[in-house]
Protein backbone atom coordinates (compact mmCIF):
# COMPACT_ATOMS: atom_id res chain seq x y z
CA UNK A 1 0.00 0.00 0.00
CA UNK A 2 1.19 3.50 -0.82
CA UNK A 3 1.38 6.34 1.71
CA UNK A 4 -0.03 5.87 5.18
CA UNK A 5 -3.30 4.82 6.74
CA UNK A 6 -5.24 7.94 7.71
CA UNK A 7 -7.65 8.18 10.60
CA UNK A 8 -7.95 8.37 14.35
CA UNK A 9 -5.91 5.68 16.07
CA UNK A 10 -5.48 3.85 19.34
CA UNK A 11 -2.60 5.37 21.29
CA UNK A 12 -1.76 2.15 23.03
CA UNK A 13 -0.54 0.54 19.81
CA UNK A 14 2.40 2.96 19.70
CA UNK A 15 2.85 4.40 23.17
CA UNK A 16 2.22 1.51 25.56
CA UNK A 17 5.44 -0.55 25.62
CA UNK A 18 5.56 -2.76 28.72
CA UNK A 19 8.80 -4.44 27.65
CA UNK A 20 10.74 -1.17 27.31
CA UNK A 21 14.02 -1.01 29.28
CA UNK A 22 14.43 2.52 30.62
CA UNK A 23 17.66 4.31 29.78
CA UNK A 24 19.87 6.16 32.25
CA UNK A 25 19.30 9.32 30.21
CA UNK A 26 15.48 9.10 30.17
CA UNK A 27 13.37 11.46 32.23
CA UNK A 28 10.94 9.20 34.09
CA UNK A 29 7.55 10.32 35.35
CA UNK A 30 5.02 8.66 37.66
CA UNK A 31 1.46 9.77 36.94
CA UNK A 32 -1.61 8.96 39.02
CA UNK A 33 -4.20 8.32 36.32
CA UNK A 34 -7.96 8.18 36.85
CA UNK A 35 -9.45 7.10 33.48
CA UNK A 36 -13.05 7.85 32.51
CA UNK A 37 -15.35 4.83 32.95
CA UNK A 38 -14.78 2.36 30.13
CA UNK A 39 -11.31 3.60 29.18
CA UNK A 40 -8.74 0.84 29.77
CA UNK A 41 -5.75 1.90 31.91
CA UNK A 42 -3.26 0.98 29.16
CA UNK A 43 -4.98 3.34 26.74
CA UNK A 44 -5.08 6.11 29.38
CA UNK A 45 -1.40 5.66 30.22
CA UNK A 46 -0.48 5.62 26.53
CA UNK A 47 -2.49 8.81 25.96
CA UNK A 48 -0.50 10.57 28.66
CA UNK A 49 2.79 9.39 27.15
CA UNK A 50 1.73 10.43 23.65
CA UNK A 51 0.26 13.84 24.37
CA UNK A 52 3.18 14.88 26.59
CA UNK A 53 5.71 13.91 23.89
CA UNK A 54 5.28 13.40 20.13
CA UNK A 55 1.67 12.35 19.73
CA UNK A 56 -1.30 13.96 18.14
CA UNK A 57 -4.83 12.64 17.83
CA UNK A 58 -4.64 11.43 14.24
CA UNK A 59 -2.05 10.01 11.89
CA UNK A 60 -0.14 12.81 10.14
CA UNK A 61 2.05 12.37 7.08
CA UNK A 62 4.95 14.32 8.64
CA UNK A 63 5.36 11.39 11.04
CA UNK A 64 7.21 9.81 8.14
CA UNK A 65 9.88 12.51 8.26
CA UNK A 66 11.05 11.65 11.75
CA UNK A 67 11.95 8.63 13.81
CA UNK A 68 9.10 8.24 16.25
CA UNK A 69 10.90 5.43 18.00
CA UNK A 70 13.66 7.80 18.93
CA UNK A 71 11.51 10.66 20.16
CA UNK A 72 8.31 9.25 21.58
CA UNK A 73 7.40 9.06 25.26
CA UNK A 74 6.58 5.52 26.35
CA UNK A 75 4.26 4.26 29.04
CA UNK A 76 6.35 1.32 30.26
CA UNK A 77 4.53 0.17 33.40
CA UNK A 78 1.08 0.47 34.96
CA UNK A 79 0.05 -0.55 38.46
CA UNK A 80 -3.29 -0.15 40.23
CA UNK A 81 -3.30 2.12 43.30
CA UNK A 82 -4.07 0.07 46.42
CA UNK A 83 -7.29 1.07 48.13
CA UNK A 84 -8.52 3.27 45.27
CA UNK A 85 -11.10 2.30 42.69
CA UNK A 86 -10.09 2.84 39.06
CA UNK A 87 -6.84 4.64 39.84
CA UNK A 88 -3.47 3.66 38.42
CA UNK A 89 0.14 4.75 38.56
CA UNK A 90 1.39 5.04 34.98
CA UNK A 91 5.15 5.23 34.52
CA UNK A 92 6.28 7.16 31.45
CA UNK A 93 9.81 7.43 30.02
CA UNK A 94 10.78 10.46 27.93
CA UNK A 95 13.89 10.53 25.75
CA UNK A 96 16.25 13.30 26.83
CA UNK A 97 16.25 14.90 23.36
CA UNK A 98 12.69 16.11 23.90
CA UNK A 99 13.88 18.76 26.36
CA UNK A 100 15.83 21.99 26.12
CA UNK A 101 18.92 22.00 28.32
CA UNK A 102 18.77 23.99 31.54
CA UNK A 103 15.09 24.90 31.18
CA UNK A 104 12.66 23.87 33.90
CA UNK A 105 10.07 25.86 31.95
CA UNK A 106 10.43 23.64 28.89
CA UNK A 107 10.48 20.48 30.99
CA UNK A 108 7.12 21.36 32.54
CA UNK A 109 5.60 22.62 29.29
CA UNK A 110 6.36 19.25 27.75
CA UNK A 111 5.45 16.94 30.60
CA UNK A 112 2.43 18.68 32.12
CA UNK A 113 1.63 21.35 29.53
CA UNK A 114 -1.32 19.91 27.67
CA UNK A 115 -2.24 16.52 28.90
CA UNK A 116 -4.19 17.47 32.03
CA UNK A 117 -7.28 18.51 30.08
CA UNK A 118 -7.67 15.20 28.27
CA UNK A 119 -11.20 13.91 27.69
CA UNK A 120 -10.34 10.26 28.33
CA UNK A 121 -8.97 11.08 31.79
CA UNK A 122 -11.16 11.96 34.72
CA UNK A 123 -8.12 13.21 36.64
CA UNK A 124 -4.34 13.17 36.39
CA UNK A 125 -1.62 13.88 38.91
CA UNK A 126 2.13 13.97 38.43
CA UNK A 127 3.48 12.24 41.54
CA UNK A 128 7.23 12.21 40.89
CA UNK A 129 9.94 12.77 38.29
CA UNK A 130 13.33 11.11 37.91
CA UNK A 131 15.73 13.70 36.52
CA UNK A 132 18.65 11.90 34.83
CA UNK A 133 22.17 13.05 35.67
CA UNK A 134 22.71 14.06 32.03
CA UNK A 135 19.90 16.61 32.37
CA UNK A 136 20.76 17.69 35.91
CA UNK A 137 24.22 18.67 34.70
CA UNK A 138 22.71 21.30 32.39
CA UNK A 139 21.41 23.26 35.41
CA UNK A 140 23.29 25.54 37.79
CA UNK A 141 20.89 24.71 40.63
CA UNK A 142 20.91 26.58 43.95
CA UNK A 143 23.07 29.73 43.92
CA UNK A 144 25.15 28.53 46.89
CA UNK A 145 23.75 25.55 48.77
CA UNK A 146 23.78 24.50 52.39
CA UNK A 147 27.49 24.35 53.18
CA UNK A 148 28.36 27.65 51.51
CA UNK A 149 25.48 29.32 53.32
CA UNK A 150 26.75 28.09 56.69
CA UNK A 151 30.21 29.41 55.86
CA UNK A 152 28.86 32.79 54.77
CA UNK A 153 26.78 33.11 57.94
CA UNK A 154 29.29 31.42 60.26
CA UNK A 155 26.53 29.34 61.88
CA UNK A 156 27.04 25.62 62.43
CA UNK A 157 25.51 22.66 64.24
CA UNK A 158 21.97 23.94 64.60
CA UNK A 159 18.91 24.90 62.55
CA UNK A 160 18.64 28.57 61.60
CA UNK A 161 15.86 30.75 63.01
CA UNK A 162 13.62 33.09 61.06
CA UNK A 163 10.52 35.21 61.47
CA UNK A 164 8.07 36.70 59.00
CA UNK A 165 7.35 40.34 59.80
CA UNK A 166 3.64 40.91 60.53
CA UNK A 167 1.25 42.63 59.99
CA UNK A 168 2.30 41.76 56.52
CA UNK A 169 0.65 44.69 54.81
CA UNK A 170 0.26 48.25 56.07
CA UNK A 171 3.45 49.03 58.00
CA UNK A 172 5.56 51.97 56.86
CA UNK A 173 9.13 51.19 55.83
CA UNK A 174 10.60 52.71 58.98
CA UNK A 175 8.34 50.79 61.36
CA UNK A 176 8.94 47.65 59.33
CA UNK A 177 12.70 48.10 59.71
CA UNK A 178 12.21 48.59 63.43
CA UNK A 179 10.43 45.24 63.74
CA UNK A 180 13.25 43.61 61.75
CA UNK A 181 15.85 45.11 64.08
CA UNK A 182 14.07 43.94 67.24
CA UNK A 183 13.80 40.35 66.02
CA UNK A 184 17.40 40.15 64.85
CA UNK A 185 18.67 41.86 67.99
CA UNK A 186 16.79 39.34 70.13
CA UNK A 187 18.59 36.38 68.61
CA UNK A 188 17.05 35.34 65.30
CA UNK A 189 19.27 34.74 62.28
CA UNK A 190 16.79 35.97 59.70
CA UNK A 191 13.64 37.97 59.29
CA UNK A 192 11.45 37.73 56.22
CA UNK A 193 9.34 39.83 53.92
CA UNK A 194 5.92 38.30 53.55
CA UNK A 195 5.39 36.76 50.12
CA UNK A 196 2.92 39.47 49.10
CA UNK A 197 5.12 42.36 50.19
CA UNK A 198 6.47 43.60 46.85
CA UNK A 199 6.24 47.35 46.33
CA UNK A 200 2.90 48.75 47.41
CA UNK A 201 1.80 52.37 47.94
CA UNK A 202 2.25 52.24 51.73
CA UNK A 203 5.80 50.87 51.46
CA UNK A 204 7.84 51.12 48.29
CA UNK A 205 10.54 48.50 47.85
CA UNK A 206 13.53 50.84 47.91
CA UNK A 207 12.54 52.38 51.25
CA UNK A 208 11.99 48.95 52.74
CA UNK A 209 15.35 47.69 51.49
CA UNK A 210 17.14 50.70 53.01
CA UNK A 211 15.52 50.50 56.44
CA UNK A 212 15.96 46.73 56.59
CA UNK A 213 19.64 47.05 55.70
CA UNK A 214 20.02 49.59 58.51
CA UNK A 215 18.33 47.15 60.90
CA UNK A 216 20.64 44.31 59.80
CA UNK A 217 23.83 46.30 60.31
CA UNK A 218 22.74 47.65 63.69
CA UNK A 219 21.77 44.16 64.93
CA UNK A 220 25.03 42.69 63.61
CA UNK A 221 27.09 45.31 65.38
CA UNK A 222 25.31 44.70 68.68
CA UNK A 223 25.22 40.89 68.63
CA UNK A 224 28.44 40.03 66.83
CA UNK A 225 26.46 37.56 64.68
CA UNK A 226 25.75 37.71 60.97
CA UNK A 227 22.12 38.62 60.29
CA UNK A 228 19.89 38.65 57.24
CA UNK A 229 16.48 39.76 56.06
CA UNK A 230 14.84 38.09 53.05
CA UNK A 231 14.24 41.11 50.85
CA UNK A 232 11.48 40.10 48.45
CA UNK A 233 12.63 41.00 44.95
CA UNK A 234 9.54 39.55 43.25
CA UNK A 235 8.15 42.09 40.78
CA UNK A 236 5.86 42.51 37.80
CA UNK A 237 8.67 42.18 35.25
CA UNK A 238 11.98 40.31 35.23
CA UNK A 239 13.82 43.58 34.62
CA UNK A 240 12.32 45.15 37.73
CA UNK A 241 13.10 42.01 39.75
CA UNK A 242 16.78 42.13 38.74
CA UNK A 243 16.85 45.88 39.49
CA UNK A 244 15.77 45.11 43.07
CA UNK A 245 18.35 42.35 43.36
CA UNK A 246 21.05 44.75 42.19
CA UNK A 247 20.04 47.30 44.82
CA UNK A 248 20.16 44.61 47.52
CA UNK A 249 23.66 43.67 46.41
CA UNK A 250 24.72 47.33 46.52
CA UNK A 251 23.47 47.56 50.11
CA UNK A 252 25.66 44.56 50.93
CA UNK A 253 22.90 42.42 52.45
CA UNK A 254 23.38 38.63 52.42
CA UNK A 255 20.04 37.30 51.12
CA UNK A 256 17.06 38.14 48.93
CA UNK A 257 13.79 36.36 48.24
CA UNK A 258 11.55 35.29 45.36
CA UNK A 259 8.06 33.80 44.97
CA UNK A 260 9.00 31.17 42.43
CA UNK A 261 5.61 29.88 41.34
CA UNK A 262 3.86 33.22 40.89
CA UNK A 263 7.08 34.72 39.52
CA UNK A 264 7.60 31.79 37.18
CA UNK A 265 10.49 29.41 36.56
CA UNK A 266 12.12 31.52 33.86
CA UNK A 267 12.32 34.55 36.15
CA UNK A 268 13.45 32.36 39.04
CA UNK A 269 16.30 30.78 37.10
CA UNK A 270 17.51 34.21 35.94
CA UNK A 271 17.45 35.45 39.51
CA UNK A 272 19.30 32.36 40.77
CA UNK A 273 22.05 32.95 38.21
CA UNK A 274 22.31 36.59 39.29
CA UNK A 275 22.53 35.51 42.93
CA UNK A 276 25.37 33.08 42.30
CA UNK A 277 27.28 35.63 40.24
CA UNK A 278 26.92 38.25 42.96
CA UNK A 279 27.18 36.30 46.20
CA UNK A 280 23.56 36.67 47.29
CA UNK A 281 21.67 33.84 48.98
CA UNK A 282 18.19 33.20 47.58
CA UNK A 283 15.17 32.40 49.75
CA UNK A 284 12.24 30.86 47.89
CA UNK A 285 8.60 31.12 48.90
CA UNK A 286 6.08 28.71 47.38
CA UNK A 287 3.02 30.99 47.18
CA UNK A 288 0.39 29.37 44.92
CA UNK A 289 1.65 25.82 45.48
CA UNK A 290 -1.65 24.58 46.93
CA UNK A 291 -3.45 25.56 43.73
CA UNK A 292 -1.30 22.92 42.03
CA UNK A 293 -0.60 20.32 44.72
CA UNK A 294 -3.57 20.23 47.10
CA UNK A 295 -5.85 17.81 45.25
CA UNK A 296 -4.92 14.19 45.89
CA UNK A 297 -5.85 12.93 42.43
CA UNK A 298 -5.20 15.89 40.14
CA UNK A 299 -2.36 18.35 39.62
CA UNK A 300 1.20 17.86 40.74
CA UNK A 301 2.69 16.71 44.04
CA UNK A 302 4.82 19.28 45.85
CA UNK A 303 7.85 16.98 45.65
CA UNK A 304 7.89 17.63 41.89
CA UNK A 305 7.78 21.39 42.47
CA UNK A 306 10.57 20.98 45.02
CA UNK A 307 12.77 19.05 42.57
CA UNK A 308 12.07 21.68 39.92
CA UNK A 309 13.15 24.40 42.34
CA UNK A 310 16.41 22.61 43.08
CA UNK A 311 17.13 22.61 39.35
CA UNK A 312 15.99 26.19 38.80
CA UNK A 313 17.79 27.49 41.88
CA UNK A 314 17.09 28.59 45.45
CA UNK A 315 18.92 28.23 48.76
CA UNK A 316 15.84 27.99 51.01
CA UNK A 317 12.34 26.76 50.23
CA UNK A 318 9.19 26.51 52.34
CA UNK A 319 8.29 22.87 52.94
CA UNK A 320 5.47 22.66 55.50
CA UNK A 321 5.86 21.97 59.22
CA UNK A 322 4.76 18.35 59.88
CA UNK A 323 4.12 19.27 63.52
CA UNK A 324 0.64 18.46 64.73
CA UNK A 325 -0.33 16.91 61.40
CA UNK A 326 -0.95 13.26 60.63
CA UNK A 327 1.86 10.75 61.03
CA UNK A 328 1.65 9.72 57.36
CA UNK A 329 2.17 13.31 56.27
CA UNK A 330 5.39 13.28 58.23
CA UNK A 331 7.02 10.51 56.18
CA UNK A 332 5.95 12.08 52.90
CA UNK A 333 7.21 15.52 53.96
CA UNK A 334 10.52 14.10 55.12
CA UNK A 335 10.77 12.36 51.76
CA UNK A 336 10.80 15.60 49.80
CA UNK A 337 12.83 17.38 52.48
CA UNK A 338 15.58 14.81 51.85
CA UNK A 339 15.13 15.28 48.10
CA UNK A 340 15.97 18.93 48.67
CA UNK A 341 18.99 18.42 50.90
CA UNK A 342 20.73 15.17 50.01
CA UNK A 343 22.97 14.19 47.12
CA UNK A 344 21.40 10.79 46.58
CA UNK A 345 17.94 9.54 47.55
CA UNK A 346 16.80 5.92 47.32
CA UNK A 347 13.40 4.99 45.92
CA UNK A 348 11.05 4.54 48.88
CA UNK A 349 7.33 4.36 48.20
CA UNK A 350 6.43 4.68 51.89
CA UNK A 351 7.92 8.19 51.75
CA UNK A 352 6.33 8.95 48.39
CA UNK A 353 9.61 8.63 46.50
CA UNK A 354 8.91 6.76 43.28
CA UNK A 355 12.42 6.89 41.81
CA UNK A 356 16.00 6.80 43.02
CA UNK A 357 17.35 10.30 42.40
CA UNK A 358 21.04 11.14 42.02
CA UNK A 359 21.68 14.89 42.12
CA UNK A 360 25.37 14.57 41.12
CA UNK A 361 26.74 17.29 43.40
CA UNK A 362 24.04 19.85 42.63
CA UNK A 363 24.01 21.98 45.81
CA UNK A 364 21.26 21.28 48.36
CA UNK A 365 18.38 23.50 49.47
CA UNK A 366 17.49 24.26 53.10
CA UNK A 367 13.87 23.35 53.88
CA UNK A 368 11.97 26.07 55.74
CA UNK A 369 9.37 25.05 58.33
CA UNK A 370 6.90 27.85 58.84
CA UNK A 371 3.26 28.37 59.74
CA UNK A 372 1.60 28.23 63.15
CA UNK A 373 4.61 27.01 65.12
CA UNK A 374 5.80 28.22 68.55
CA UNK A 375 8.29 27.36 71.32
CA UNK A 376 6.53 24.17 72.42
CA UNK A 377 7.04 22.74 68.93
CA UNK A 378 10.80 23.33 69.07
CA UNK A 379 11.85 19.83 70.27
CA UNK A 380 9.76 18.13 67.57
CA UNK A 381 11.01 20.49 64.87
CA UNK A 382 14.63 20.00 65.90
CA UNK A 383 14.19 16.25 65.86
CA UNK A 384 12.26 16.03 62.60
CA UNK A 385 14.15 18.54 60.47
CA UNK A 386 17.62 18.21 62.00
CA UNK A 387 20.33 20.85 61.69
CA UNK A 388 19.95 21.64 58.01
CA UNK A 389 16.74 23.63 58.11
CA UNK A 390 15.29 27.05 58.81
CA UNK A 391 12.58 27.25 61.48
CA UNK A 392 10.34 30.26 61.02
CA UNK A 393 8.15 31.64 63.79
CA UNK A 394 6.08 34.62 62.65
CA UNK A 395 3.30 34.93 65.20
CA UNK A 396 5.44 32.70 67.44
CA UNK A 397 7.90 35.60 67.73
CA UNK A 398 5.80 38.74 67.25
CA UNK A 399 2.95 37.40 69.39
CA UNK A 400 5.10 37.42 72.54
CA UNK A 401 3.36 39.45 75.27
CA UNK A 402 6.49 41.52 75.92
CA UNK A 403 7.24 42.39 72.30
CA UNK A 404 9.34 41.30 69.35
CA UNK A 405 12.83 41.16 70.84
CA UNK A 406 11.76 39.04 73.85
CA UNK A 407 9.86 36.81 71.41
CA UNK A 408 13.08 36.31 69.48
CA UNK A 409 14.99 35.62 72.70
CA UNK A 410 12.45 32.96 73.65
CA UNK A 411 12.82 31.15 70.33
CA UNK A 412 16.61 31.27 70.41
CA UNK A 413 16.75 29.95 73.99
CA UNK A 414 14.30 27.18 73.08
CA UNK A 415 16.40 26.18 70.08
CA UNK A 416 19.70 26.22 71.97
CA UNK A 417 18.14 24.15 74.77
CA UNK A 418 16.85 21.55 72.31
CA UNK A 419 20.15 21.33 70.42
CA UNK A 420 22.08 20.97 73.68
CA UNK A 421 19.71 18.28 74.96
CA UNK A 422 19.97 16.40 71.68
CA UNK A 423 23.77 16.61 71.73
CA UNK A 424 23.74 15.18 75.25
CA UNK A 425 21.86 12.19 73.88
CA UNK A 426 18.38 12.94 75.21
CA UNK A 427 15.31 11.85 73.26
CA UNK A 428 13.58 15.00 72.03
CA UNK A 429 10.44 13.15 70.98
CA UNK A 430 9.84 11.76 74.47
CA UNK A 431 11.35 14.40 76.74
CA UNK A 432 10.57 17.50 74.66
CA UNK A 433 8.17 19.16 77.07
CA UNK A 434 10.46 18.41 80.00
CA UNK A 435 13.44 20.00 78.20
CA UNK A 436 11.39 23.12 77.48
CA UNK A 437 10.19 23.37 81.09
CA UNK A 438 13.71 23.02 82.50
CA UNK A 439 15.15 25.66 80.20
CA UNK A 440 12.37 28.15 80.85
CA UNK A 441 13.61 28.55 84.44
CA UNK A 442 16.69 30.36 83.14
CA UNK A 443 14.98 32.79 80.78
CA UNK A 444 12.03 34.97 81.78
CA UNK A 445 11.30 35.77 78.11
CA UNK A 446 11.17 32.06 77.32
CA UNK A 447 8.99 31.34 80.38
CA UNK A 448 6.50 34.00 79.26
CA UNK A 449 6.33 32.45 75.77
CA UNK A 450 5.75 29.00 77.25
CA UNK A 451 2.87 30.40 79.27
CA UNK A 452 1.18 32.08 76.29
CA UNK A 453 1.28 29.08 73.96
CA UNK A 454 0.90 26.19 76.36
CA UNK A 455 -1.36 23.57 74.79
From Swiss-Prot:
The disulfide bond which can form in the large chain dimeric partners within the hexadecamer appears to be associated with oxidative stress and protein turnover. The record marks 325 as: Transition state stabilizer. The modification N6-carboxylysine is found at residue 192. It catalyses: 2 (2R)-3-phosphoglycerate + 2 H(+) = D-ribulose 1,5-bisphosphate + CO2 + H2O; D-ribulose 1,5-bisphosphate + O2 = 2-phosphoglycolate + (2R)-3-phosphoglycerate + 2 H(+). Substrate binds at residues 114, 164, 168, 286, 318, 370. One of its GO terms (cellular component) is chloroplast. InterPro entries: RuBisCO (IPR033966), RuBisCo_large_chain_AS (IPR020878), RuBisCO_lsu_C (IPR000685), RuBisCO_lsu_C_sf (IPR036376), RuBisCO_lsu_fd_N (IPR017443), RuBisCO_lsu_N_sf (IPR036422), RuBisCO_lsuI (IPR020888). Keywords: Calvin cycle, Carbon dioxide fixation, Chloroplast, Disulfide bond, Lyase, Magnesium, Metal-binding, Methylation, Monooxygenase, Oxidoreductase, Photorespiration, Photosynthesis, Plastid. Its EC number is 4.1.1.39. One of its GO terms (molecular function) is magnesium ion binding. Its cofactor is Mg(2+). Binds 1 Mg(2+) ion per subunit. RuBisCO catalyzes two reactions: the carboxylation of D-ribulose 1,5-bisphosphate, the primary event in carbon dioxide fixation, as well as the oxidative fragmentation of the pentose substrate in the photorespiration process. Both reactions occur simultaneously and in competition at the same active site. Heterohexadecamer of 8 large chains and 8 small chains; disulfide-linked. The disulfide link is formed within the large subunit homodimers. NCBIfam families: PRK04208.1. The basic functional RuBisCO is composed of a large chain homodimer in a 'head-to-tail' conformation. In form I RuBisCO this homodimer is arranged in a barrel-like tetramer with the small subunits forming a tetrameric 'cap' on each end of the 'barrel'. This is Ribulose bisphosphate carboxylase large chain. It comes from Brownea coccinea.
